[in-house]
Amino acid sequence: MNTSHHHGLHHSFRNHSQGALPVGKPSHGDRGSASGCYEQLLISTEIFLTLGLVSLLENILVIAAIVKNKNLHSPMYFFICSLAVADLLVSVSNASETVVMALITGGNLTNRESIIKNMDNVFDSMICSSLLASIWSLLAIAVDRYITIFYALRYHNIMTQRRAGTIITCIWTFCTVSGVLFIVYSESTTVLICLISMFFTMLALMASLYVHMFLLARLHMKRIAALPGNGPIWQAANMKGAITITILLGVFVVCWAPFFLHLILMISCPRNPYCVCFMSHFNMYLILIMCNSVIDPLIYAFRSQEMRKTFKEICCCWYGLASLCV
């Protein structure tokens, strides 16, 4: 986001933090232990590249598994696929922007202001759009799990595959437009406040859904258990799905919260020494964001036997080990 005369998500926040050094405090050029807190934490390009590549492969595997396995052709997994696409774009965009900046710094790429600005705007728009898509996809999954538990007998009439596809299309259309607008007007404090407000509003909404879900789930499961057939088994599977999504939400909050705290401090106390010290670790917060994209596919694999089975089949086919796929 372009919050200073330097462009790009990485450089704008780094330079904003450095430019906000309190008067009388040592800058990055001064010696002494105190100055270390105000220097931007440097992380090698190789780490960004590695995380980006791992996330790319993992999330492609998730998307391929959902497309390949017809048992995974359900609204919840379609929303998970949307989340995987968002995770993939976040990591790839972060890694790509880091590589471009490294090439420019090393003199291996044309250092023209207009070209750099346009490239950074594209990368930043992708990152911002993907962030919004992640939040909305998580909310869609939460609503889907809520319906399966509290409206179990009407679920297939309420949440059809066609309706899920329409929801995903609306999510990505809205998030793409919003992401571009956020970057175009990112120099405005109002835009940052809107982004922060959206993040916490969506988290509060999802938290309220899950609290209500788990508080009343046991009572509802007892009612379903009284019905003939596979009601109890199906309900238990739905609860397992709800727990999986709760884990995803928890990981999302842990990985993204430092970034949004950085934004809050950047707006509220840009010259406070403690705030500046926190903001100096911006690169670490980018790493946490990319780690979220790496962790999510592992959660899918750990929590879903069907996903693990499909992952194994795809990996075996990739390596030509067809006999092991049986």
From Swiss-Prot:
Key words of the record: Cell membrane, Disulfide bond, G-protein coupled receptor, Glycoprotein, Lipoprotein, Membrane, Palmitate, Receptor, Transducer, Transmembrane, Transmembrane helix
SMART domains listed in its UniProt record: 7TM_GPCR_Srsx (SM01381)
The protein's name: Melanocortin receptor 4
Locations listed in the record: Cell membrane
Subunit composition and interactions: Homodimer; disulfide-linked, also forms higher order oligomers. Interacts with mrap2a; decreasing ligand-sensitivity. Interacts with mrap2b; increasing ligand-sensitivity and generation of cAMP.
Topological domains, Cytoplasmic: 68-71, 143-163, 212-246, 303-326
Sequence similarity: Belongs to the G-protein coupled receptor 1 family.
Xref: Gene3D superfamilies: Rhodopsin 7-helix transmembrane proteins (1.20.1070.10)
Sequence intervals crossing the membrane: 47-67, 72-92, 122-142, 164-184, 191-211, 247-267, 282-302
InterPro entries: GPCR_Rhodpsn, GPCR_Rhodpsn_7TM, MC3-5R, Mcort_rcpt_4, Melcrt_ACTH_rcpt
Biased composition (Basic residues): 1-14
Lipid tethering residues (S-palmitoyl cysteine): C316
Gene that specifies this protein: mc4r
Source organism of this protein record: Danio rerio
GO cellular component assignments: cytoplasm; plasma membrane
GO function terms (MF aspect): melanocortin receptor activity; melanocyte-stimulating hormone receptor activity
GO BP term (any one): energy reserve metabolic process
Region (Disordered): 1-31
Function according to Swiss-Prot or TrEMBL: Receptor specific to the heptapeptide core common to adrenocorticotropic hormone and alpha-, beta-, and gamma-MSH. Plays a central role in energy homeostasis and somatic growth. This receptor is mediated by G proteins that stimulate adenylate cyclase (cAMP).
